[in-house]
């Protein structure tokens, strides 16, 4: 996929530093090539800028250790005229060991040195400025910061330097700049102090959860500021609330569909019911009518099949395992029966459903994800996107996304309880991740409007967020970036995507989807018409042109032997029937009083549900 954008990274050592690693991870996240130049002699400075085989440079990063080998006037000014005159520059990894005159020379006196904070709490905060053009959804926020050493920048001209990030400690008014933007002859130049959690930077950068996100926040902000639409970016901000287990009866325990609809209209959010297929023929007409009349507020996805405990557990168990084994062929049979039942549900109610699997109790092993792919599911969404028994993906960029294709080339997404911290929501919005919440009916025990506060927080944090069904979110689960020719590259996650051209001109999308071609592809269609595609290594490639202000649907259909009409959808298993009755009794009667709700809260929070109903 040729996009023609790259980051010029100038270093002075062959050993990768923490700051260099963070830039490389950030570039990988945004789909930018890194053109590395080793500066060990001032005479070689300019040859990297004019090499004919280099792509268009959209950002320049210089490690502070390389400054002695870089003539700042030559690199930042004279050497970057023409195509590179306005390219933003980041000087990163600044520590007290960097000579002050090198910093002062490179910054024209804006940054004159660095020091280490003395007596700074290990739980200090990293305050982010309100400069939304740089900080986006993180504007004005405070990130947890647990660095082993906290270096900061000495700013010489405080009036004309924009402090983007600074350390602060509780109980004091002191501020320590760590990420600064200055303007040098019309060019944006950023300076960042070294940021790391541990001496082992490889381990430190393997996961950027919120306690470590401050490490990479600066490079990510810089790269997106410098490269703009040439970075991989999502096509919108999406959010969803999923409620697990209910069938369509009014009320279902503490969940009143009529009441919830009023709250959704008031607070502006969308609810997906993770529907147990066993309940396919139990829906009440009143609730069915409510769903059919309000598709912008209600939707249905698939929640297992029978929901008999950990329904998609290990294929083989060992002594001490909590649940019985569920061999792969049994799990595939459950997937087939779930689809057969959902097709019956669709015929009986006239309500469509999304082929998005929410596994009961926990995500299945990886090979089951291949089964979902074979039966043309869009994605799976669970509290954790790593399959049972699988290790975390080694790629650092995977830890910045809530979706991974690492397992069977099938999209697996994270979701969170409503207790997810606001800063975590903001980080996901900044990264372009969908905001997916889930709850059970007892969440509404005290108030049917219990979710409104969370919805308000998300809507206020990102006014352009769209609350959609899990299916709609999956169909918009792709990244795009601007090409040199004005068209777009697309990195697809799901096998069903909606391309929306919001421009006033025709746009061609060059689509790549990581693909193992197992299971085999039956066909690819664009707006229901067969479309040719290419195979290149482990990728499916196709090109789609979309007229101005129009959209087109791309669908990849995989081969399988499913004939929904021939699937046995009967409820002949007495054990499952008893279990479902007991579960309904728990949800619809026990949980509707204070004592029952207290038990229900303990039931889920303690993990007792993994042992019982």
Task: Specify the residue positions occupied by each region the protein language model found.
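A glycine-centered loop/beta-turn motif at secondary-structure junctions
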Residues: 4-7, 26-29, 56-57, 120, ...
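Helical hinge/lid and interdomain linker segments adjacent to catalytic or ligand-binding clefts
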Residues: 12, 16-98
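C-terminal domain-boundary segment and adjacent tail
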Residues: 34-36, 218-220, 224-235, 262-279, ...
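A glycine-rich, often tryptophan-bearing local segment used as a flexible ligand/cofactor-contacting loop or short
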Residues: 67-139
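Metal-dependent polysaccharide deacetylase catalytic core of the NodB/CE4 family, i.e.
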Residues: 84-85, 91-105, 109-118, 270-369, ...
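C-terminal beta-sandwich/jelly-roll accessory domains of carbohydrate-active enzymes
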Residues: 117, 470-473, 480-613
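Active-site beta->alpha N-cap acidic-glycine motif
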Residues: 206-299, 354
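Catalytic grooves of carbohydrate-active enzymes
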Residues: 226-255, 264, 329-333, 344-358, ...
């Amino acid at each position: 996929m040729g996009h023609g954008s790259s980051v010029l990274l100038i270093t002075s050592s062959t050993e990768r530093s923490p700051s260099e690693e963070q830039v490389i991870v950030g570039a990988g996240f945004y789909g930018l090539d890194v053109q590395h130049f080793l500066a060990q002699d001032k005479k070689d400075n300019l040859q990297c800028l004019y090499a004919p085989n280099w792509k268009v440079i959209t950002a320049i990063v210089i490690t502070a250790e390389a400054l002695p080998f870089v003539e700042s006037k030559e690199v930042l000014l004279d050497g970057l005229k023409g195509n590179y005159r306005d390219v933003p520059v980041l000087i990163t990894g600044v520590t007290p060991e960097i000579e002050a005159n090198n910093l002062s020379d490179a910054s024209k006196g804006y940054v004159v040195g660095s020091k280490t904070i003395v007596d700074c709490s290990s739980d200090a905060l990293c305050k982010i400025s309100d400069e939304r053009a740089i900080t986006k959804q993180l504007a004005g926020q405070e990130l947890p910061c647990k660095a082993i050493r906290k270096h900061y920048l000495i700013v010489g001209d405080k009036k004309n330097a924009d402090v983007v990030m600074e350390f602060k400690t509780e109980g004091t008014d002191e501020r320590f700049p760590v990420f600064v933007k200055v303007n040098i002859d019309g060019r944006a130049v950023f300076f960042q102090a070294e940021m790391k959690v541990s001496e082992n930077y490889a381990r430190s950068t393997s996961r950027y959860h919120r306690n470590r996100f401050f490490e990479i926040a600066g490079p990510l902000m810089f790269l997106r500021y410098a490269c703009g639409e040439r970075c991989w970016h999502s096509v919108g901000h999406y959010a969803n609330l999923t409620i697990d287990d209910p069938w369509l009866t009014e009320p279902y325990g503490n969940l009143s569909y009529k009441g919830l609809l009023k709250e959704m209209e008031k607070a502006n959010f969308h609810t997906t019911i993770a529907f147990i297929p066993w309940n396919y023929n139990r829906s009440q007409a009143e609730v069915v009518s409510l769903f059919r009349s309000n598709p912008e507020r209600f939707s249905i996805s698939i929640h297992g099949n029978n929901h008999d405990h950990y329904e998609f557990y290990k294929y083989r168990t060992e002594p001490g395992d909590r649940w019985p084994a569920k061999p792969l062929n049994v799990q595939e049979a459950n997937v087939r029966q779930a689809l057969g039942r959902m097709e019956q549900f669709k015929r009986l109610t006239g309500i469509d459903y999304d082929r998005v699997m929410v596994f009961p109790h926990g995500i299945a092993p990886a090979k089951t994800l291949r089964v979902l792919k074979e039966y043309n599911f869009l994605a799976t969404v669970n509290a954790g996107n790593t399959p049972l028994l699988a290790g975390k993906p080694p790629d650092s960029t995977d830890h910045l996304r809530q979706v991974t294709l690492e397992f069977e080339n099938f999209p697996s997404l994270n979701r969170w309880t409503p207790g997810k911290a606001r800063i975590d929501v903001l980080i996901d919005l900044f990264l372009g991740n969908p905001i997916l919440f889930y709850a059970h009916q007892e969440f509404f025990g005290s108030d049917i409007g219990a979710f409104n506060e969370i919805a308000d927080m998300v809507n206020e944090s990102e006014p352009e967020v769209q609350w959609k069904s899990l299916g709609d979110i999956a169909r918009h689960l792709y990244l795009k970036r601007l090409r040199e020719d004005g068209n777009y590259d697309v990195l697809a996650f799901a096998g069903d995507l909606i391309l929306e051209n919001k421009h006033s001109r025709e746009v061609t999308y060059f689509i790549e989807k990581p693909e193992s071609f197992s299971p085999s592809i039956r066909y690819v269609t664009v707006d229901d018409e067969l479309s040719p595609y290419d195979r290149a290594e482990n990728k499916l490639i196709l090109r789609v042109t979309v007229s101005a202000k129009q959209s087109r649907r791309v669908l990849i259909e995989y081969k399988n032997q499913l004939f929904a009409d021939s699937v046995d959808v009967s409820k002949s298993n007495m054990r499952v029937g008893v279990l479902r009755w007991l579960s309904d009794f728990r949800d619809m009667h026990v949980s509707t009083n204070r004592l029952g709700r207290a038990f229900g809260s303990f039931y889920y929070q303690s993990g007792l549900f993994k042992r019982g109903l």
